[in-house]
Amino acid sequence: MELRSEQKDFVDYAADMIKEGKYFICEMPTAFGKSFSALMLAKKLIDEKTVQRVIIATSNNSLAKSIFLEAKAVKDMPDYVLGIGKSNYLDLNKLALFLDSDIGSEILPLNKEIIEAALKKLTIDFPDILIEDFLNELDMVDTNKREYIASNLALEKSNSESFKEYPIQITNYAFLLYKFMFDEKYEEPEDTAYIFDEVQELPNMAELTLNSSFSLYGYYLQLKTIVKIIRDNPSAPKTLVKLLDEEVEHTKTINEIMQDEKIAGKTLMSNELVARKATAVLNKLFNQEKSKALIAKLNKFYKKDPFFQLGIFLNKFNDVKSTLRSKDLYVSFSQERGFISFHTYDMDIKLKLADRFWSKIDSFVGITATALLTQDDFELEIYKRAGINLSDIKLVDRVIKGRKSKVWPIISFKGILRPEQATYSITDKAFIEDDEKRFEYFADEILRGYDGKNTMILVGGFDEVKLLAQKLESIKDKLILAEQGRSVQNVIENFKKSGGILIATRNYATGINLKGETLERLFITKLPYPVYQTKKWAILKEKNDRFFWFEYTNEMVITFRQAIGRLIRSPEDTGKIFLLDGKFNSLPEVTKKRLICFLEKVAVKE
């Protein structure tokens, strides 16, 4: 494969930025070939001895694996390796023993030939099997079962084995951030350059790396499940069953004590009230003599008669204690379920990125299809969103130096796609408040506009997936539905095979590639704002309402850009985009102009 002219322009320009020790983010349109371009940049940097090592990092295992496999097509590629952490690979020896056990037949009640066929398929292009790929290939949806396999059948690779000293290393953000964020002394050699694919996802991955949660409701449900299974086991000691029954009632009692009108329906920042409640839960659940005796008996029982729900429960136990002891804790209360949840959330994530991550990065190239949030090609907003401090930050004992001198203005490279390949239309109707009538309107518009073509419809959540499916009952045989617990990759593979109409959530706005006739119609029934009840947005809204709306809108614009980019993936593709959300018409004019600007980059108005 040879570089196209626009790809060569990127490689040459980015290599110069690395030589000058710059931070450089560029925007690449759909079908630019960003993975291939990143690999060729890494090759150039190593071949010309600009640096000794290049680390290519991306947002998830699937993308990292895809880049690794694409490197096989690059002629005379320097040595490269995939390193994505020690708990992502399937241990085939553990799997063989697992399949012969009682617990194995409970979790994977499948014919061995089916499992062997899956393993054979997954090793055609890739020597090590990713647990995520294995579970998706078997179409496993149950979250508890997935979690059990991930926890118990992982290949025990050390970091050095999975991330060897090769000139080019391909990894994911979680692995890279874990090394930097949890080992303050960790540094790569000075002659290392970084290429960050999907760079806009880096701060989101930092949040996932640093945060945890404990739900009293989840704990209660796990207990009830374990009680039922053990009670039905004739060999279970009666004393264990009695202790479990008492623990279930104990948990309900604790929850009643924890309830407080001051926190009902609210999100609280870390304060004395939260600390007292967390301490109370910790003491009442885990520090009572009965609780300690219960855990000891459960561990003993598990050694004799294991089952996966109990394995998950015991594995999580220490993590729960760690969460409840955290200083950065807040409480949320579910009025629907009647239980409180505790969450750690570090409001200083950007500060920690500046201190522990960016301060150790000498130069990098960031690649994204959604760098720009306005029509201004020279904005630096994406650098700030990624936690790069443009000015000095004064801490108690030191100063984190500002990185503005390293930051280079965003450059948007031209691609090979033309807006004339697609059309777009925007509803002129006001938002319909009544859910039933609104979804009837959506169904009418979809039936009128999809023309029998392969179609994706983006809705607001899984409840809306079901509601729209009901309204499209007349074509139910064509529908494929996103499901909670089922991976995006798994659903997309089914859609590729069968075609039809995929009703999906905002999670499907990025990371999928549906070329040609695989996708020709895209309906957006709800502007893809993030779920504001999640901890990040709930805390931000409580702390600074004005800044919340600024960030909240920016997040929607980024996801909207990603969503409309799903339709046209190659110069041969054609299609239509339908924006059906009536709330568009009540948006501020500046937000409307931003969305229309990005629509017109990929389509012309119908």
Where do the protein language model's features map onto the residues?
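Conserved interdomain hinge at the start of the Helicase C-terminal
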Residues: 418-460
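Conserved RecA-like P-loop NTPase helicase motor core
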Residues: 414-432, 485-585
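Conserved helicase motor "Helicase C" RecA-like lobe of SF1/SF2 P-loop NTPases
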Residues: 459-484
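Signature of the SF2 helicase/ATPase Hel1-core->accessory helical subdomain module
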Residues: 62-65, 69, 148-292, 369-388, ...
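A contiguous, basic/glycine-rich beta-loop/short-helix subdomain that forms a polymer-engagement track
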Residues: 144-164, 182-186, 287-414, 482-488, ...
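Walker A/P-loop
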Residues: 20-40
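Conserved pre-motif I regulatory segment
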Residues: 1-27
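A substrate-engagement module of RecA-like helicase motors
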Residues: 51-167, 245, 293-296, 537
